Amino acid sequence: MIITPYLNPRLVKPLKWLAIIILLYFLYFSLFSINKKPGKPRKPPKAVENYTCPFEKADFSNFKDKKLEFHKNNGTDPKILVILDSLFSRHGKSIIQILNSQKFAFKAEAISKNLPVLTSAKRGKYSLIIVENYYKYLNMARWNRQLLDKYCKEYRVPLFSFIASKPNDQLKRIRIKGSSLWMWQNQRINRLTVSPSPIHKISKIGAYRNLTTQESDWILFEISENFESILTGTVKNGYERAVVLRDLGREDGVEKVIFGRNLTDFQIKITFLDALWWAMGDEKLFGLDRFVQVDIDDVFVGAQSTRIVEEDVRHLISAQNHFRNFIENFKFLLGFSGSYFRNGDDFEDRGDEILIENAEKFVWFPHMWRHNHAHEHNFTYLESIMVQNRLFAQNMHLPIDYPYAIAPQHDGVFPVHEQMYEAWKKIWNVTVTATEEYPHLKPATGRKGFIHSGIHVLPRQTCGLYTHTQFFDEYPEGFQKVIKSIQGGDLFFTILLNPISIFMTHQQNYAHDRLALYTFENLFRFLNCWTNIRLKWQSPVESAKMYFEKFPEERIPLWTNPCSDPRHQAILPPSMSCSKKSLPDLLIIGPQKTGSTALASFLALHPNVSQNMEIPGSFEEIQFFSGQNYLKGVEWYMSKFPNETTVIFEKSATYFDNPSAARQAAAMVPHAKLVIILQNPTQRAYSWFQSLFQHLIAHKDPIAMSSESLDVILNSTSSESAKFKIRQRCLSGGRYVHHLDKWLEHFSLQQIQFIDSDELRKEPAKVLSSLSKWLDLPEFPFETHIRFSPSKGFHCRLINGKTECLGESKGRKYSEMSQELRQKLDGIFALDNSALFKFLRKNRLKIPDWLEEAVRIRV
């Protein structure tokens, strides 16, 4: 190689590298340009005909503006008893899903020889009875049928039931057993019409549809003066018969609503919903307003050729204006990850620019800068990417009108990633978000809201559209699936069942065939056709305020075990692990002053058993399911069980009579076993008061100073006074069956072990051996590790030859209870003791001697 005199040989090699770099630079950008620009012109969206109401021109003005009517009963709790063919029946699950969606309290039981208890303390326990199978009701054992009918008549409780055709039965016209009502089975109907009835609220009276299917398994009822048609079927010869019937109760005193079809038909399902609100609602609880919010997530995120272009943006603006014909003040909410702005081809980049130019026409909310998954990052990193996204919004003049944000894939919202919540509040001042993951993705009817760390979390809904659904002809399983969802299916009922619906869509659903615009246009048309629902829009902040005013019981989150849900496990922050067991297998739930501390200390002697770490300020108890510690969350609770053994337990005696503990414990540890200690409630109340009294005296509490004895507390009658509240707390733990009912709503009886307090005090080793066997633990010689202490007057642990007894506050002796006070307390607990006796005997459980004696004396 000849080197010119003007070129230093030492520069040749660097210049070669520079030339290569420049070449690669231009090659890269030329290839990048080939991949990205210019974009291919889009085909026009496929034209699909919109839904047309079959009675669009019909005049139903005679039925409008009718005052909504509700059933009135006599002194019953707002709860529903559901008697199912089986707890696993498909139709039964559909009933329960609707009850869950409407937040109705209910008890579901499979039909059996025995009815559940219907009354409590001179009140009816249920405001509505639902029997899944009307044949089972008609053929119920005589005693049970009389008992159920008597309850319904006395408390004016309506009964709902469903009846199905028997396919192989040759009889067509059948008289209902014990009634003048006639029914026709295996029928085919040509038209189904909503009949005038006070039952209807959502259903539009007069609405009808002609049935094109050839199903011939309908049950129809003949209408007479004692029976009113709610939903009417017209058969081929023109006769009209009831498909859903209201029995006015003139013959047997029991008002009924009988369905001649299951909930698979959308008109039947709406009628069932109307009937539920007629039976359980009132003017304050029920409303026809439904608030709809449509979020467009990831407006800049997506692969090239899948994103929106200029024409899509123009159409989006036009559709937003058009949707206001259906929904007052409607606006789309657009979520952004700024890093992906102008990341498409030429046409898509122009679409992004047009969107920014029209930013003021929409409501905007932040995701993460690069669509980051929150659980993978700490506070510092989350803070930095949120700042980047905020700077993008400021530079592009995006109107962030509300403190609302959505985490990509709802990551970090639930299960809670505390550091994301903190970063949200610091950078965006977020007060409202939404997720589809609380408490679980499915069933959708079970989704709820909660408030955590000052952020209101609302339930979010899906609409059957995802990032890959862009063309009518390529929809998975065919687009008929979406049409079915719109026309009386899941999407239609999402709005009916939820006062506030926040829908998740993606920008891809507004490109190409614009499936989202078709979906919501036709959903609104169908709702307008068939229902009296009033669709409205409001800000996320207003929705959060309304939601938690309507459902205040949901403010406190219901923590679940994240390791039991694969979706939750996949988005756990690194600080939480499912690799080891970190939740208890056993809960000793009390009540207080029954020997629960002694039981826990003895059980912990077993080498295969471990207890929670001690918690400062609450003695040895975690008190997670019964106090402020619950707000600290799942991660805090799991951290209190560091030792992995065969059985992990915790003891918190405050759980037993806490109104929320059973529900919260069942959500977190549904398979845990429970131990309840049965102590004479008279003696327990006396010990509880003496312990509290001594504590209050030591702190010179004015209530204690003015209360010379438990007698004074028991005579307190003013429900607002501090003494009365102490009275209620004192007596509460002894009302065993009252509190057991709550625990048995969430745990089976097989999960509960009852221990006699007297037996525990006298023969602790025997009790512990029995408990260990129930827990499937290896045998352990408790008798050699527990010794009676004459000086203490109770049994203590024996560790390495030394006696270890409980502290001074445990096992203390109090002055003898007076006979007069004992009789007063015995009288107060008489009914509770009787109920406990019956409960134990009915379930063939051991009855303590003190209970046998208490019931014998009363008799």
Swiss-Prot record:
Its EC number is 2.8.2.8, 3.-.-.-, 2.8.2.-. The keyword Signal does not apply. Residues 34-575 are annotated as: Heparan sulfate N-deacetylase 1. Pathway: Glycan metabolism; heparan sulfate biosynthesis; Glycan metabolism; heparin biosynthesis. 3'-phosphoadenylyl sulfate binds at residues 593-597, 687, 810-814. Residues 576-859 are annotated as: Heparan sulfate N-sulfotransferase 1. It comes from the Eukaryota. The chain crosses the membrane at residues 14-34. The active site is at residue 593. One of its GO terms (biological process) is heparan sulfate proteoglycan biosynthetic process. Residues 35-859 are lumenal. Residues 1-13 are cytoplasmic. InterPro entries: Heparan_SO4_deacetylase_dom, HSNSD_N, NST/OST, P-loop_NTPase, Sulfotransferase_dom. Keywords: Disulfide bond, Glycoprotein, Golgi apparatus, Hydrolase, Membrane, Multifunctional enzyme, Signal-anchor, Transferase, Transmembrane, Transmembrane helix. GO terms for cellular component: Golgi apparatus; Golgi membrane. Glycans are attached at residues 50, 74, 210, 262, 378, 429, 608, 643, 715. GO terms for molecular function: deacetylase activity; heparan sulfate N-sulfotransferase activity; hydrolase activity. Disulfide bonds join 796-805. It is found in: Golgi apparatus membrane. It catalyses: alpha-D-glucosaminyl-[heparan sulfate](n) + 3'-phosphoadenylyl sulfate = N-sulfo-alpha-D-glucosaminyl-[heparan sulfate](n) + adenosine 3',5'-bisphosphate + 2 H(+). The keyword Hydrolase applies. Monomer. Belongs to the sulfotransferase 1 family. NDST subfamily. PANTHER family: BIFUNCTIONAL HEPARAN SULFATE N-DEACETYLASE_N-SULFOTRANSFERASE (PTHR10605:SF56), HEPARAN SULFATE SULFOTRANSFERASE (PTHR10605). Essential bifunctional enzyme that catalyzes both the N-deacetylation and the N-sulfation of glucosamine (GlcNAc) of the glycosaminoglycan in heparan sulfate. Modifies the GlcNAc-GlcA disaccharide repeating sugar backbone to make N-sulfated heparosan, a prerequisite substrate for later modifications in heparin biosynthesis. This is Bifunctional heparan sulfate N-deacetylase/N-sulfotransferase 1. It comes from Caenorhabditis briggsae. The gene is hst-1.
